[in-house]
Amino acid sequence: MLMVISPAKTLDYRTPPVTARHTLPRYLDHAAELMVRLRELTPQAIAELMSLSDKLAGLNAARYAEWTPDFTPANAKQALLAFKGDVYTGLDAEDFDEADFDFAQAHLRMLSGLYGVLRPLDLMQPYRLEMGTKLANARGKDLYAFWGERISLWLNEALAEQGDDILLNLASNEYFSAVRRPLLRGRVIDTEFRDLKNDQYKIVSFYAKQARGRMARYVIKERLRDPEGLKDFDERGYRFSISHSTPERLVFLRDRPMD
C-alpha cells in the first residue's frame, strides 16, 4: 500500500533531524527547471502570484536565489522532518525509529509543486510553491500542465517497487488533482474525516488535515499493507463508518475533538 500526502507551507530547518539518513529527490532536474522560472519573478510579482505579504514574498525570493541543486545535509533537510503543519503534526515523525523510516520510505510519498514527488528521507531545500499556483511555464499555464503525466507515472513506479496496487489518498484535492487517475496502475482509496458540528458530520479542514497525518502514522507504525486494516483506525476519537463508506472511499466520523 502506497500513501500520498500533501506538503506544508510551514517549514522547520532549525530543529536537528532525528536521523542522519537521507536520500536525494529523483526529479531535481525538473525542480531546477521550475526554479529558473521562479527566479525571473520580482518580490512584487511573487506576492501577487501567490497572494503573499511583502515580507513572505521577500523571504521566498531569497529562497529562490539561494536554491542550488547540490543538496547536502548542510543546506537541506529530510522532507518528512522539514515540513510542519497540521498533517505533519498528526504524523509526528519526530519519534520515528529507523525501522519506521524504512517503512515510510517505501510506503509514503509527498506531492510537491516544486519537487513533484518526494520520499520521506529525500533532502529538500526550503521553498514555497503550491500546486495550484498559476505559474506559466514552458509546458503550460500552471503546475498541473508542467507536471502532466509524470507524477502518475512516478507513483506507478513506486507501486511496482513494492509489488502492490493500492494507493491510499491522504492528500488534499489541490494536490491529488496533479495525479491523473486513469493512468494509475492500481486502485485508489480516498479518505474522509468528518466531525459532528451542528448535528451534522462535516469536514473541518484543521481536524481533517491532522487526521490524514495521523492515519499515515498509523499505517507506518502498524506496518499495514492490507487496506482492510484501515477500518480499525480509531485514533483521536474517529471511528470507521460502514454506512457512509464505499470500497473506494473510507469515511471516519467523530463526535467530539480529542487532544
Swiss-Prot record:
One of its GO terms (biological process) is response to hydroperoxide. GO terms for cellular component: cytosol. PANTHER family: PEROXIDE STRESS RESISTANCE PROTEIN YAAA (PTHR30283:SF4), PEROXIDE STRESS RESPONSE PROTEIN YAAA (PTHR30283). Belongs to the UPF0246 family. This is UPF0246 protein Avin_11220. It comes from Azotobacter vinelandii (strain DJ / ATCC BAA-1303). The lineage of its organism: Bacteria, Pseudomonadati, Pseudomonadota, Gammaproteobacteria, Pseudomonadales.
